[in-house]
Every structure is written in structure tokens, then in C-alpha cells.
């Protein structure tokens, strides 16, 4: 099994209240990006990496790749206006010889090697697989400030990344999205629309997406606890 990895690292740090792009914010003395780089570098089935970064941060990303000791070929590209655009741009740079593509958000620095490998294994079997966790909170549908419906959570899962797919399936899904002007918040949504089976592998509650200062604080605490072990 040969896989390409994509790290989506083109997000801004605006909601974090930071001047630097989110992937370059430091946690425990290291950038968010560096955490994903080190995990990907440890997975033997991943043969190449494409990183989508904000315009002007290509050199900074290359320095992170070097510091992380990544030995596979790495391409760095400027991301698009939206996440979906960044992934589409990155897919075009992956090798057509790859069986699978695994997509990961740099804003989830706590994803583990185990989660990546589980996604890749499931995707090789089913066509697609994502990390996710069972929903813990009760959901309410609200209209005009009042509860309209309580949604049963028994079968609901909260999607995370990494998300892995057969390369041909992911390419076709993004091409279809362009042709039909489909906008989605993750790649699994686009792939599901093609009729491909997308399986779920259990992620981790620590694998949160850092969007707000409170998210950053949680991950900083997780990292500090690990460093103290």
C-alpha cells in the first residue's frame, strides 16, 4: 500500500487572535505543523507529502519539514481561498501511483500514528475512512430561539481528521464538486456523495481542532501533561 499525505495548513490565525497563521502557532515550543509532520514521517506506507500553506509561508514550512526530519519527498504549495480549494490543489500534486491519499488538518496536532494507520487500513478496504468520536452532547434543533427538535445522538459521530481515501475516488469527488458547485466542510462529505463507502475509525477526544483560544489552551494543557510524564 502506497499513500500520499496532505496537510492542510493554510488557515489564518484570526479566530485565535494571532498574527501568524494557525499552523505556525507554537505549542510546547513547537509549531502545530511540526506535530503532524513527525507523525506522518513515522508511517512507512506514506511515500510523499504535500502541504498547503498561506501565500508567503512556503519557506517557513520547508524549514519545519527539515526540522522534523521528514525523509520522504515533500511538495509545498500555496493554499486556496477555502479548505476545499486547498485540498483540491494539493491532490493535483500527489503521485498518480499512490493507492491512497490521507488528508489531515494541521490544526489537529494531537492526531496519533495509530489513528493515521487505522484510517489508511480501513480506506484500503472500503474506499474511504475517517477518524471520528461518538457524540457526547445532546443536540437540539433551534428555530427563532426556541427548541424545535431534540436529535437522537445514538448514531451520531463527530468527524475529525485524518481522513483517507482511494486516490481515484478522492480525485473524482473533488472534480464532481467543481462541476456541480458542491461546497462541503470535509472531504468525506464529497466522497459520500459519490456512493463510496466511508468507514469510521475511533479517533480521540484529544484530537480536537484548534479554532479558538480556549481550544488552544486545552491542547497546551495536554502537551504540558505529556511533557511532564
Model-derived features with residue positions:
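Conserved N-terminal catalytic core of the sugar/cofactor nucleotidyltransferase
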Residues: 34-98, 178
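N-terminal glycine-rich phosphate-binding loop and ensuing alpha1 helix
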Residues: 1-59
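Conserved beta-loop-beta/alpha segment of the NTase-like Rossmann-fold superfamily
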Residues: 75, 81-146, 160, 167
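Short, conserved active-site loop motifs that form the nucleotide-linked donor/cofactor pocket
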Residues: 3, 73-75, 156
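Residues at the starts of beta-strands that form the adenosine-phosphate
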Residues: 47-49, 128, 197
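Hydrophobic packing residues within well-ordered alpha-helices of enzyme cores
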Residues: 16, 61-65, 119, 139, ...
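Conserved alpha/beta core of the MobA/IspD/sugar-nucleotide pyrophosphorylase nucleotidyltransferase superfamily
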Residues: 81, 156-229
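Short aromatic/basic micro-patch
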Residues: 26, 110, 150, 164, ...
